[in-house]
Amino acid sequence: MKTSSLTGSLFFTTPKFARLRFAFKLSFAIVLSLFLGFHLQLETPRWSVLTAAIVAAGPAFAAGGEPFSGAIRHRGMLRIIGTFIGCIGALVIIIATVRAPVVMLMLCCIWAGLCTWVSSLVKVENAYIFGLAGYTALIIIVSTQGTPLLTPQFAVERCSEIVLGIVCAILADLLFSPRSIKQDVDRSIGELLVDQYRLLQLSMSGTEKEAIDAAWHALVRKTTALSGMRSSLMLESSRWQNSNRRLTSLHTQSLMMITQACETYLILQDVPTPVKSSLKMVLDQPVESLRDVHCRVKALRHLIAADSRDVPPTLIDWVGAATRYLLLAKGVQANGRLNTIEADVLNSDVEIKAPSAETHHAMINGLRTGVATALGCLFWLSTGWTSGSVCMVMIAVVTSLAMRLPNPQMMAKDFLFGTIYALPLGALMFMFIMPSTQQSMLLLCLSLGGMAFFLGLEVQKRRLGSLGALASTINILVLDNPMTFNVSQFLDSAIGQIIGCFLALMVIMLIRDNTKAHTGRTLLNRFVYGAVSALTTNRARRKENHLPALYQQLFLLLNRFPDDIAKYRLALWLIIMHQRLRTLDIPQNAALSAFHRQIRATAEQVISARRDATRSRYFAQLLDELERYQQMLTEQQLPPSVTAPVGRLTGILRDYQHALSN
């Protein structure tokens, strides 16, 4: 009896049960929005059903399983904001150009492209707002093309239906116990520190470059993933506020440990120094858990406190960062109030946000959306096809949502396959099942819920076309009040969806994104600026924490150039130089301060230069200024510990001058 009850309790914690629970959650959200839509006498309950499906299924498709607590609520809030922005934009466009329908449609295409451009520049988690705002305005304008005076009424109805769908999705998420991410955060914190210690062991033992590269590459990705978990934890509940602050600083400590371990490796490669036997004894011991690392760090602290001679300064810094990491990790697990020591750690640095390095990429994305919607508009106007508006809307939806993803073509293919799958599936529902349920609301809900349950399982597997099939099938089912079954209109809408997705895919493939090289060069020059900006006599500027921004750009570099290990190493060296130059004890001097400002201004000119010749000229000027600056430091009779890092930075920039400037 005990064995069977234990087996049953274990089943409720398995991934299989989580998938079934989410599929039921999706079905409940869709059925509830359908029932309330008809009960409240909404004109088109289809919009509320479609909204509930997209809000609930979108995060699951992105996560590859049941989304964590708070993800659906956050998605719903973003959709509400984007819908209101799109409605306001549509009203402004219609009021300004009500007497010129063609100009109105062209302005709508420009609006969609502009929103896509903005969505490519903002944070990924907020990009959904602007992508949605772009195609919402287009949907409203296209839907009211024949009756522009009814636009305010249509906008209000559309907002009401969308809000109803979002409320249903959030209610379903709350009722069916979404999983908390807190346990995953605690587990990731421990695993991350264990991997950090293993990287330190590799660095101190003089392992080959390939092993070091693989280790720090994996650590950068895990640290970035932990930062993403922090965002999800804050979406879950406001009670994690203190843990959120600790995780923000813990992210910085993790990046510092990566930097210190890699710098230790480079120092030992340049100047091979035998490691003290006592340190080697501690470092050679394997670690398997957070407790093991805690014991090793404690032993290292005692050894350094007893005799810090012949201990690399970077190892001392690593132990300090690991100590702060352990302190913050304990606070995250307990989620208690911040103590004095933790508050000092949190207030020690001022994190700096980096501007986007994908401005050219964003312009290409906006151009793709604008051109695609304009082509759809011309196709609609030239053919006079009744479902041309459906084609145009699908073009806007696909191009607006796909552009922010790393692989827009794959997203467009998902929508294309989804619309193709939706044709037979929708025909089965529309021609055979739904007409038989007109006398019973219960049968209608069961039929639609069964379809949603099946597609909900496929969405979590990230099956190609699953998310597109769910949205496209609901879109072509005439869930209006009262319901009508016009087969020719159904086929027109289904074919219009397919043609729209095909045209969107063609535009994405034809308008190629050739900004990859430009983005890579911009990112590398941002690392150069990050290194030289650490040269300062201003204490407030020295407290600025550029590490999260620099590693965020490094993570983008890893994604844009997945196989270019030379770029990773150069970027990591520049991050190491930033961290080393930040700790230099440069005396207060007006001449040095003026030279610091000049060096930063020249580095900014290198980043902003549009032509290769101009960029090369400014880069050569930057090298000359760094050499003169090193001479000034020597004339000030500063020790080699201050002048040598500047010379090392100048040497790195000179060695990679061609890659950074041309």
From Swiss-Prot:
Keywords: Cell inner membrane, Cell membrane, Membrane, Transmembrane, Transmembrane helix, Transport. The chain crosses the membrane at residues 22-42, 52-72, 76-96, 102-122, 129-149, 161-181, 378-398, 415-435, 439-459, 465-485, 491-511. Its main location: membrane. InterPro entries: PHBA_efflux_AaeB/fusaric-R, PHBA_efflux_pump_AaeB. It comes from the Bacteria. Pfam families: FUSC. The keyword Ligase does not apply. It is a multi-pass membrane protein. It is found in: Cell inner membrane. GO terms for molecular function: transmembrane transporter activity. GO terms for biological process: carboxylic acid transport. GO terms for cellular component: plasma membrane. Forms an efflux pump with AaeA. Could function as a metabolic relief valve, allowing to eliminate certain compounds when they accumulate to high levels in the cell. Belongs to the aromatic acid exporter ArAE (TC 2.A.85) family. This is p-hydroxybenzoic acid efflux pump subunit AaeB. It comes from Pectobacterium atrosepticum (strain SCRI 1043 / ATCC BAA-672) (Erwinia carotovora subsp. atroseptica). The lineage of its organism: Bacteria, Pseudomonadati, Pseudomonadota, Gammaproteobacteria, Enterobacterales.
